[in-house]
Regions:
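Long, leucine- and charge-enriched amphipathic alpha-helices
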Residues: 63-101
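Basic helix-turn-helix/winged-helix DNA-binding cores
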Residues: 1-56, 60
Length: 101
């Protein structure tokens, strides 16, 4: 997902409806640090497509795989770290390709 995936689009009720969960679950996930939606000037939570994708991961891990929230936190941290490392590898491969020319 590009930068457009980070644009805040959905208020909490719409995000909950998209995901098929209750709004209090979204508030709890935020409190636990699993998700951090942007806030409007009026302090309204706004969820991006990237947030929705992450919340789908949370839902899958909890409902389908029975992982508790502490486990989900660790898994999401590892996913983020792997993603960061993959981006770094791609950058280094590009640099290496330039130096070989």
């Amino acid at each position: 997902m590009g930068a457009e995936g980070n644009e805040p689009r959905y208020v909490i009720s719409i995000a909950a409806s998209i995901l098929g969960i209750k709004t209090h679950n979204l508030r709890y996930y935020e409190k636990m640090g699993l998700i951090q939606p942007l806030r409007s000037r009026g302090n309204i939570r706004l969820y991006s497509e990237r947030d929705i994708a992450r919340l789908r991961q949370v839902k899958t891990l909890t409902e389908d795989m029975g992982v508790n929230l502490a486990g989900i936190e660790v898994i999401l941290r590892m996913i983020d770290r792997v993603s960061t490392l993959q981006e770094r590898v791609e950058e280094l491969e590009i640099k290496l390709g330039r130096t070989r020319k």
